[in-house]
């Protein structure tokens, strides 16, 4: 199906994680790893050219330009770029008690300021549910019932945001424990109505996404309003969808 290439920045920069005297500049005197650049261009062109539907995803944490740009435009030709900025802002926001979110809506809208720079994929990955970072469910604030509701709201926002979507296994039914390669997922949780509800919610969101082409065709959206107490966004495509993140009912 494809590859997610980890730590791309460490390959693109000769001085990545190194001090002065620990690296040698390229032939132009710069810090770009020219061989790595050509390797990515070649391998992405080769794989994407041979296999229709295959994706190549770059986990790249810097502002390197045209990660998903075409080779003819001096891009690296990846299918998508891992949107780490969105992920960090999203998780920081969702961890907050709803009372304090009104002053932090910028965390949910900032990704739109750079959305057009690359083809992004929104990811809640294995990296975020290991090493005492807690499962997605246990990142949510409040009592257990509140955690489920917050997680449902977060997934809905993610599905309506620009960019392709990717959940790590177990997140679709609110796995409680952190992920470990030494054990399987806690499938027995699906016998619990709340966990089954989350699974059905994710299924309905995916069906909604696939039924509405305006949610995925152009991946373009504009923020209409970012007041402290609300956040409204509009996806400007073949259809108009307005998302209101507020406790006030709108008609």
Where do the PLM segments sit?
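Short acidic/histidine-rich active-site segments
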Residues: 2-14, 168-173
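Active-site beta-strand/loop architecture of penicillin-binding DD-peptidases
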Residues: 185
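Alpha-helical packing segments of well-folded alpha/beta enzyme cores
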Residues: 1, 39, 43, 154, ...
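Catalytic cores of secreted or luminal carbohydrate-active enzymes
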Residues: 193-219
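Conserved alpha/beta catalytic core and glycan-binding cleft of carbohydrate-active enzymes
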Residues: 19-181, 189, 210-216, 220, ...
